[in-house]
Each structure stands twice: as C-alpha cells, then as structure tokens.
Amino acid sequence: MIATQTFVSVFFFVFFLVSLPFFSSAAPPSSDSIYESFVQCFSDKTKSPQAQITDNVFSRTNPSFSSVLRAYIRNGRFNTSSTPKPAIIVTPRSDIHVSAAVTCSKSLNFLLKIRSGGHDYEGLSYISDKPFFILDMSNLRDVSVDIADQSAWISAGATLGEVYYRIWEKSKVHGFPAGVCPTVGVGGHISGGGYGNMLRKFGLSVDNLIDAKIVDVNGQILDRKSMGEDLFWAISGGGGASFGVVLGYKVKLVPVPETVTVFRVEKYMDSGAVDMVHKWQSVGPKTDRNLFLRMLIQPVTRKKVKTVRATVVALFLGRAEEVVALLGKEFPELSLKKENCSEMTWFQSALWWDNRVNPTQIDPKVFLDRNLDRANFGKRKSDYVASEIPRDGIESLFKKMTELGKIGLVFNPYGGKMAEVTVNATPFPHRSKLFKIQYSVTWQENSVEIEKGFLNQANVLYSFMTGFVSKNPRNAYLNYRDVDIGVNDHGTNSYEEGEVYGRKYFGDNFDRLVKVKTAADPDNFFRNEQSIPTVLSKA
C-alpha cells in the first residue's frame, strides 16, 4: 500500500539504486542526468529540437514543476510535503509525444503514471512509492462532434464538461451517457466503465463505444482494428492504464428530448425518510428507464438534533407532468408535485446536476473551466446491493450514520438498459445488481489525526453494511478506487494479490483481463497498485 504519510527521501534514494541497474551503484543517477537522458530519447523519438521539448517535459528543478503537478491533484490527501513526487512530468501535445513518453520511460526503467483528469480517488494516477514519471494528458483535449454520424471522437485529456459543451454547440437534442462531475477526465472515466444519470436508458459510457486509439507498450499507435477486439474489450471498462495509454475514444451520441425534467425532494427521519429510502429500492431500479432517481443519505444536525436527511435527486427524459403522474402511482411516499420540478434542456440539466445556480441562465462556458489546483480531502468506497435492504436495516443504518456523524451514502439505481447487457459484454460485471452504493466523506482540514478519524468512519460504515451487500466476492466499482480492498506490490505473488481486488472489480471477467494483459504487456510495464497482473506472475 502507498504510505504517503511515512514516505521519506532515504527510501526514494534506495529505490533509485535498485531500479536503475544500468547506472553504477557507486554513482547514483542525479535528477539532471535522468532528465537529460529522457529529453535526448524524447527528442530522438519525436524528431523535435531539445529546445522545444522543455515546454512539455518538466524536471523537479523547473520553476513550473510544482504548479503542473498540483494542477490535477483532486484529493488533498495526496498533495502534501511527504507525498512521493515524480522525477519528470510529461505533458504531451500529440500522439507521437505519448508514444515517445512510453518508450523513453520504459528504456530508463521508470514507472509511468497516466493522469487524465486527476480524479483517481486514491491518487494512483500520479503517485507511487517507486521511481516514476507522470504522463499528464490534459493538453490532449480535442472533442470532434459529427452530428450527421451521431458520433464524436474524444481525446483522453478532455473533461466531461468539455464533451457536453462541444455536443451542445452542435445539437440541443444529443447527449452522451457519462458522469455528472464536469472536471472528470475522459481517459479514466470511460476506460473504467463510466456512468451517469442516463445509464438506465442508454447504459454505461462503454456501452456506447465505436472505436478507440491507444499507445501500446512498444510505442505503437493502434486503433480498434489494429489492436484487436480483445484489447478493445479490455479498455472498455477494465481500466486503460493496465494495458497502455488510451489516446481517445469514438463514441455514439444518444438522442435526448428538447425538454427534460429535474427535481430534488428531501425528507428527514421525523418526516418519512426511512419509508422513502425503503420504497426507493423497489422503484428506482424498476421504474421507467427514462427516469433516474439517485438517493443521497447524509447525517446532519437539524434544530440542534442529530438526524439523517434522505434526498432524491432525479433526471427524467421527458416533461414534468409525465414524471409527476408516474411517481404519483409508483412512489407516493415521495409526494412529488409539479412545483418541485424544473424543465430545461439536457445540457442545462447537466449544469443543474453540477449544483450550478440558475442553470437556465448561466453561461454554458462554465463547463470549460477545469477548476485547476483545487482539492478537498476525501475518501470513497463502493458496494453493490443485489436484494432489498429490509426496513429495519434502513433504520439501523440511519442510527449508525448519526453515531458516526460525517460519512454519507449515495445510492445509484440500475435496471433498465443496464440489466439487458450481458455480464461479459464489457469488463464491467455488475449488470444485474439493484443499485450501487458510494461511501463518501469529504473534509477541508489538513490534519493527520482528522484524516484518521474520517477514514475510520468510512471503514466502520463499510463494515456495518456487510450483511446488506453482495458477497463472495464483495463487489466494487473500479472508478471508485479503494486501496482498502487490496493492493499489488508486483512481486512474486502479483497474480494472487491482483486477484483479490480484481475479482471484486471485475468478477469472472478478471480471467479474460489477465489473458489480454499477458498478451499486450507481458513484462507488466503498465502497472499501478491495482492494475491487472499477468498470468506469468501466477505462482
């Protein structure tokens, strides 16, 4: 496991000696010599003058190094003085740059961390306890929308906000099924499955892929045809960073109505919250597939009393009167009225889901703001529920949450299109579940003791939920990265270590992912603390 709080420079020095056998042990490589070797290699591969390369390759002595590093760190837990830092950051501006970064990192025997938007909850895209470089994809942000073909090519460094904005520029009746956080990077989001508030209608992001481009371990730039269907399948939900560097995806755009409806309804423990959450389990995953009913559950203090607030946040691909009539029959506990609803365009609903004030009036270009160098402290975990939690289970859950005080839950319903896709169509295996749970705790204080307290809250609630969630294995969602469920040191037991978390993320699809990994990257160059191992590492 990454030990960001205890990492010390002595260990980093030792890792340099061990990991770079081509340098004399009597004269360990300096950061300058590593940088010079990389720049020379990069120049040779890209046919670029070394003077031009300095704008895209940053050593630790570069005045811009710290700002480039911090820009896409989205979790303050991994932005401390003791957090391991890369020897070099590469910010490619072309596919050739990416290819060169791969081959040069490999030749220098440095681990390559691939960062798109920086939203990896455990920071695995930009930290390591081994000597490493960062490949920061943020400059590769092209989004080319073809409305006639109802498709778009999206570069890995683009954000979801940029994707939605570029679609909106071309059409008010097209969208793409992906997440609600506009600063999330496309590369990690889609390669890990990708979901949003249209998943019950259109499935996951990876259910809407046409093509992809990737740089493989040999620096080759491959599309779907040249990489083959096995590798294309693997990077369609199995996590791209285990197999290469995803350059981009060609996706199918989906039709959305001119007018959609959003609403938010909240209740507290003394006003029907338990009944609402209990009933939600039988409605959310089974209702009209045009309706997505997210459930937020949060401990709060109200009128000086600790309680729990349950909030339904919804998107309906249709008019307000339709959804009010529908839920009047299916979910009377919600007490939904038309005045609770707001009608708007699909793009405006994306702004609303991002908690923007007056989404029908705001400048759409706010989705082009990447909010750089801004990070709270946080921890996320995930679970899947296959059968409804009984009412007394909901009551006991609320009691436990009030005791803990901070940790919240998000229930995301499945059903609809999700239940129609076979379990092995993509690496994402959780199709038949009723809903997914996200455990979420966020704080602002930079304190080791405060962090320990909140991490403990997450672990206590996760343990409490054991009897209500999936078993053998206890499933998890790759894009809600959680190192508590297992990590890989990539030593002699790499396969066995990888199987622990791999089965939780991918179920039986883990076996095929291992085979693809072994064929595509037999020496395991592309690796992180939760990557897919090779079959060659099986004891």
UniProtKB/Swiss-Prot annotation:
Domain spans labelled FAD-binding PCMH-type:
82-256
What does UniProt give as the signal peptide span?
A: 1-26
Give GO cellular component annotations, separated by semicolons.
apoplast; cytosol; plant-type cell wall; plasma membrane
Taxonomic path? Eukaryota, Viridiplantae, Streptophyta, Embryophyta, Tracheophyta
Q: Which cofactor does it need?
A: FAD
State the disulfide connectivity.
Answer: 41-104
Q: Where in the cell is it found?
A: Secreted, Cell wall
Q: Which InterPro entries match?
A: BBE, FAD-bd_PCMH, FAD-bd_PCMH-like_sf, FAD-bd_PCMH_sub1, FAD-bd_PCMH_sub2, Oxid_FAD_bind_N
Key words, A-Z: Cell wall, Disulfide bond, FAD, Flavoprotein, Glycoprotein, Nucleotide-binding, Oxidoreductase, Secreted, Signal
Task: List the source organism.
Answer: Arabidopsis thaliana
Q: What class of enzyme is it?
A: oxidoreductase
**One term of GO molecular function:** FAD binding
Q: What is its EC number?
A: 1.1.1.-
- Where it mainly occurs, coarsely classed, is secreted
| Known glycosylation sites | 79, 340
Q: What is this protein called?
A: Berberine bridge enzyme-like 21
Q: Where is this cross-link: 6-(S-cysteinyl)-8alpha-(pros-histidyl)-FAD (His-Cys)?
A: 119-181
Q: How is it modified after translation?
A: The FAD cofactor is bound via a bicovalent 6-S-cysteinyl, 8alpha-N1-histidyl FAD linkage.
The record describes how the cofactor is bound as: Binds 1 FAD per subunit in a bicovalent manner.
In which domain of life is the source organism classified?
Eukaryota
